[in-house]
Amino acid sequence: MIERFMNRIAGARLPALAVAAVAALLGGCAGRDTGANEPWDPIEGANRFVFSINRAVDIIAIRPIAVLYRDWMPPPAQRGLHNVLENLGEPVTAIAEVVQGTPGRAGTTLARFLVNSTIGIAGLFDVASAIGLPKTKEGFGNTIGYYAGVEPENGGFYIVLPMIGPSNARDGVGMAIDASIDPFSIVTFSISSTAGWVYAGARFGATVVDTRSRTLYALDDLERNSVDYYAALRSAYTQQRAEIIRQKRDRTGPRAELERRDKLALVR
């Protein structure tokens, strides 16, 4: 049941230093035996309290709005909004890819951003995918996990964030870095604090509605089949994030680099 939920669901010195610092911090937690894919939840009482508030807000406001949006907004408009939100995230993805040491992917991401922002009319249409520029989605939560010398499951302590939901130390710091280097946030806040907060609020609200509308069935199914919805969501989040980090490290991380070197040695 949790697996079904999981399935549905150069100039970067400062970010690199932050990644290294958090990776070292998480490395210090590596000795804690929490079991494979077992979340470390030392503040469970506080997390459950925040979860209950988030749950109430979801029942009263977010879910009903998401249902109306899904049922009444024309599908092309829904796709357009989703595309715009994805396009706004491309610059941060490109920066994260540079820090991860994959400049080729970063170049593709920037090309996607330029194509979709112009020909795609501010990102409404994903023209880039149609012409063979594949999408990747990165952030500094992934980047910290990529470099951290610990098992992918060890993202630090589990935390439930107000209005955001499941997270952990690694991903929480990653989100903070993402927000601090986002070019659109920097530009709008440089205009005025009012402009910055209006932009941030509008983008956050649109993201919440878009994401919630896309997870209605998955979350309903998870809750319906769970004895403890909090624990089920915590487990699903931890397993999903661990798998994402594991795949990243296996495909492009240190282990993959060693395998490439071994293959070259055999060829020679």
Short names for language-model regions:
Residues I2-A18:
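Bacterial N-terminal signal peptides that target proteins for export
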Residues A30-D33:
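Bacterial signal peptide processing site
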Residues N87-A169:
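Mid-length scaffold segments of soluble, non-membrane domains
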Residues N37, N142, Y146, V150-R268:
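A structured, mid-to-C-terminal "fold-capping" secondary-structure block
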Residues P74-R79, E86, E97-R105, A130, ...:
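Surface-exposed, polar/charged faces of alpha-helical domains
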Residues G35-A61, V67-L68, E86:
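Post-signal peptide N-terminal segment of mature Sec-exported envelope proteins
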Residues L25-G28:
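C-terminal motif of bacterial Sec signal peptides marking the signal peptidase cleavage site
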Residues V50, A66-L81, Q100-G101, T108, ...:
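N-terminal post-signal-peptidase region of extra-cytosolic proteins
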